[in-house]
């Protein structure tokens, strides 16, 4: 469990750094626009849009910018049509990697993703080559100073599949269909949620050496820096040394 939540923290810290460069804003606006185009502009009835807006607010995006992205999505006339794509491959050490993209040019995107894999000792696979190693689930992270018994009772009653305390966090895992029910139940009870998102969660983590980890992180960084890439998932288990170096 710890490997999942700690990597989520690494991604969160990197996200904050990206936000300072303005790079993450482009990806968030794109996700908001596509979510609104696909499911409408009402956050209460569009879970994908609700999650995208929450990510944008957490990255300190102005509400006006978010609203404009929603309007563009609902209007549907501005810009090129974005297509959701998922690429699968292997990184250094045979680590399984999923890459979720939104793009208006599939050829450009696959070329850039393939180049990143090749440059850092990985290779792009075929559809289904590694996706079976991951499960689509909800993940909710809370500070461990919250009342653990209360958190566990509310989360399980609302449909969570697992609750665990790791280091300074409480990690709650939910089926996709129960994600918003659990999240709302916790918030309605006055409990503070630090992070929450839908994710592709590795069923089993693969321990890797520190040397392999350095190469893998370079690959993941390069993938995440691509404009068309929205999310990168792996089944790597990092050592404490590597995790601490990411702080």
UniProtKB/Swiss-Prot annotation:
Q: Give yes or no: UniProt keyword Transcription.
A: yes
Which InterPro entries does this entry report, sorted A to Z?
Integrase-like_N (IPR017856), TACO1_YebC-like_2nd/3rd_dom (IPR048300), TACO1_YebC_N (IPR049083), Transcrip_reg_TACO1-like (IPR002876), Transcrip_reg_TACO1-like_dom3 (IPR026564), YebC-like (IPR029072)
Give the GO biological process terms: regulation of DNA-templated transcription
Query: Which keywords fit this entry according to its UniProt record?
Result: Cytoplasm, DNA-binding, Transcription, Transcription regulation
**What are its GO cellular component terms?**
cytosol
What domain of life?
Bacteria
Q: Where in the cell is it found?
A: Cytoplasm
By what name is this protein known? Probable transcriptional regulatory protein lpp1249
Source species of the chain: Legionella pneumophila (strain Paris)
From the broadest rank down, the organism's phylogenetic lineage runs: Bacteria, Pseudomonadati, Pseudomonadota, Gammaproteobacteria, Legionellales
């Amino acid at each position: 469990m710890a490997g999942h939540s700690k990597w989520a923290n690494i991604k969160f810290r990197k996200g904050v750094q990206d936000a300072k460069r303005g790079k993450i804003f482009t990806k968030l606006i794109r996700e908001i626009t596509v979510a609104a185009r696909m499911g409408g502009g009402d956050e209460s009835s569009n879970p994908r849009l609700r999650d995208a807006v929450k990510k944008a607010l957490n990255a300190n995006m102005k509400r006006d910018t978010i609203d404009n992205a929603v309007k563009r999505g609902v209007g549907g006339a501005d810009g090129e049509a974005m297509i959701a794509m998922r690429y699968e491959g292997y990184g250094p050490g045979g680590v399984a990697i999923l890459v979720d993209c939104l793009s208006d040019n599939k050829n450009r995107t696959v070329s850039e993703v393939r180049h990143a894999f090749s440059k850092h000792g990985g290779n792009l696979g075929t559809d289904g080559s590694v996706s079976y190693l991951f499960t689509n689930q909800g993940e909710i992270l809370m500070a461990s100073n919250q009342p653990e018994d209360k958190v566990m009772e509310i989360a399980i009653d609302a449909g969570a599949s697992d609750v665990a305390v790791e280091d300074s966090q409480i990690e709650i895992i939910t089926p996709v269909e129960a994600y918003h029910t659990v999240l709302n139940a916790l918030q309605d009870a006055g409990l503070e949620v630090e992070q929450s998102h839908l994710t592709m969660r590795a069923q089993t983590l693969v321990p890797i050496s520190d040397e392999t980890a350095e190469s893998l992180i370079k690959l993941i960084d390069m993938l995440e820096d691509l404009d068309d890439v929205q999310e990168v998932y792996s089944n790597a288990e990092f050592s404490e040394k590597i995790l601490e170096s990411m702080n």
